[in-house]
């Protein structure tokens, strides 16, 4: 983590895996079921599919902070996002990114 990033700064995590088309409905169902019960430490989560490679799926999550993610990880045996991919028969790769700046949402 860079010196400029506050410990309370949000953190983005990405889980990704390649899935065959027959696995897509299972992943969507697992995500929709899990997204209904977001952990308190998480601000938002998205299930995304690559337009260039439809077999590539990601769960992108925004956490309150790195400490919040660590607190969540200590509270579970296996993180929910990993279980979602495993339900669809895939083992996801994990990466994390410090959120260093955000843009406000435009008013409608």
Description of each model-found segment:
Residues 1-57, 62-78, 87-108:
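Short S/T/G/P-rich N-terminal loop/turn motif that feeds into the first structured element of a domain
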């Amino acid at each position: 983590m860079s010196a400029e990033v506050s410990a309370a700064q949000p953190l983005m995590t990405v889980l990704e895996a390649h899935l065959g088309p027959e696995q897509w409905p299972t992943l969507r169902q697992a995500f929709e079921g899990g997204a209904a019960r977001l952990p308190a430490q998480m601000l938002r989560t998205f299930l995304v599919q690559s337009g260039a490679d439809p077999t590539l799926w990601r769960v992108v999550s925004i956490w309150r902070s790195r400490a919040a993610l660590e607190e969540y990880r200590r509270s579970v045996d296996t993180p929910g996002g990993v279980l979602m991919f495993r339900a669809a028969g895939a083992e996801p790769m994990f990466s994390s990114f410090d959120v260093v700046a955000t843009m406000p949402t435009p008013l409608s």
